[in-house]
């Protein structure tokens, strides 16, 4: 009897540096497409040939995305490291029926999701060189923590030495802007007869990083100092976690770092004001500015 692939049965593994990390996800998707080029076949002698021929010999880069909880334990910190450093890894998606491999994957976007009364989470999206089915899971499996703890965040934001209160929503997002080096040769095109012999991208390079986000605040009578304003040299820090200080803090932290921001009013049923910010300084180590702090 045939076996179906169900998303609810999926197990996700990241393999980096020879180690295998199992990541519990709440959702995942992935795909890869091939490039198709058409060419005319109509001639003076075959005017009825109005449908063009097709050439398929190369693939686009694969895409993937998944969501994961930002737990207190350190089981998922490999994701933070791969995001900050834009390092390649292999991503495996295992079902009851099959194993799918995304080879030479890189994270292009990591969104740190911070909402009141909801556990911290991270949304990841990225690209990969090649997607294959029927793969074999590799790497040395690392042990997992015995506990699995969520964090309902306490939010602490300071902008230009002033504390922002009455926060409705916060977002932090790191983008890795990459470019794939295509692998296209005459010999490769001639030898491409099916998907396995198609030409795939050969490598990627990092062009730039963008660290930005948003802060949505209830608009009150005593917090209007930055309403409809902007600043290109603001100092911003954000902490969303268990509310502890120092080495006991668990959760997301950003800054203090130099940023630009614009502020705008949102006139809904309850008036809000939103800060759209972007980091403008270039730290020696991004890991000292943006942190997912765990046990």
What are the residue ranges of the model-derived segments?
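Signature of extracytoplasmic/envelope-associated structural regions
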Residues: 1-295
């Amino acid at each position: 009897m045939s076996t179906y692939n169900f998303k609810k049965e999926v197990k996700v593994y990241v393999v980096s540096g020879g180690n295998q990390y199992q990541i519990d996800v709440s959702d995942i998707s992935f795909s890869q497409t091939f490039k198709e080029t058409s060419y005319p076949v109509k001639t003076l002698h075959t005017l009825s040939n109005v449908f063009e021929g097709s050439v398929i010999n190369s693939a686009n880069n694969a895409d993937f995305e998944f969501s994961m909880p930002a737990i207190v334990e350190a089981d998922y910190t490999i994701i933070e490291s791969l995001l900050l450093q834009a390092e390649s890894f292999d991503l495996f998606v295992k079902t009851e029926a099959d194993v799918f491999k995304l080879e030479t994957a890189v994270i292009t976007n990591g969104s740190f999701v911070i909402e009141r009364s909801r556990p911290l989470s991270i949304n990841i999206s990225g690209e990969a060189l090649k997607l294959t089915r029927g793969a074999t899971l590799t790497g040395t499996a690392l042990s997992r923590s015995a506990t699995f703890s969520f964090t309902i965040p306490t939010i602490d934001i300071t902008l230009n030495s002033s504390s922002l209160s009455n926060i409705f929503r916060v977002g932090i997002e790191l983008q890795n802007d990459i470019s794939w080096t295509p692998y296209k040769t005459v010999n490769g095109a001639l030898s491409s007869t099916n998907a396995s012999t198609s030409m795939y991208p050969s490598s990627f390079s990092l062009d730039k990083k963008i660290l930005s986000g948003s802060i949505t605040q209830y608009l009150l009578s005593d917090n209007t100092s930055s309403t409809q304003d902007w600043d290109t040299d603001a100092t911003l820090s954000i902490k969303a976690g268990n509310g502890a200080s120092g080495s006991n803090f668990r959760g997301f932290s950003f800054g203090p770092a130099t940023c630009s921001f614009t502020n705008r009013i949102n006139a809904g049923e309850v008036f809000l004001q939103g800060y759209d910010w972007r980091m403008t300084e270039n730290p020696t180590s991004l890991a000292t500015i943006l942190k997912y702090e765990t046990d």
